[in-house]
Amino acid sequence: KAGDVLLLDDGKIILEVERSEGLKIVTTVIQSGVLYSNKGVNLRGGGLSAHALTDKDKKDILIAAKADADYVALSFPVNADDVRETKKLLKEAGSSASVISKIERAESLADDVIQEILNESAGIMIARGDLGVEIGDAQLPAVQKRLIKLARSSDKIVITATQMLESMIANPVATRAEVFDVANAVLDGTDAVMLSAETAVGEYPVNAVKAMSDVCLEAEKSRRASLSRHRLHSHFEDVDYSIAMSAMYAAN
């Protein structure tokens, strides 16, 4: 509708909607740039009506099933129904693959919605690119910490991804800020950190993998990292479990 702001290619191009005419949208370019094919479109604040599973996604699920994939990453789930549909398609294709839900939509962050998504998924990926475009980069750090904590309390896998070592696409060494970013994700309890363009199109893919591995190994030596290694499911709120966990931590 008029006044909506569309963000293209991870926010590099910004358009403001003037009016819509059926399937045609007339916009004013607020921030220009070169738009390449297959780039994403986000609505500032969330609310796009696009379905999580496209026809191409459904075909790709069949390919993943034939390839005997262990995991399938579901992009842009709005709610748990999207996860359930993906699991249904995998089952019908004869696949036992688990679903990792990529948290990229503002709508999926509501307390009840994210918990239902976690309950239906093997784990979540904190996909900071599209998520940051929708909610704003300033909110990302707190949201990332919240999602890691929620995943761990639900005993689910959590992966932190996007621009972890972005500068290493073109440089052989990471910035200090990137080192801190990776280390803090590990210290918060993420199960995995993931490289994207750094290894897909970067000039120093091996350096990037080694740099990330080195940071993770050093962060895991921290006492804080050892304390976050155990998942505290809600049943540990019982007195007996709490005493047992306290004894274990004291012994360690």
Which residues are covered by each model-predicted region?
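Non-catalytic helical/linker scaffolds that mediate oligomerization, partner binding
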Residues: 1-252
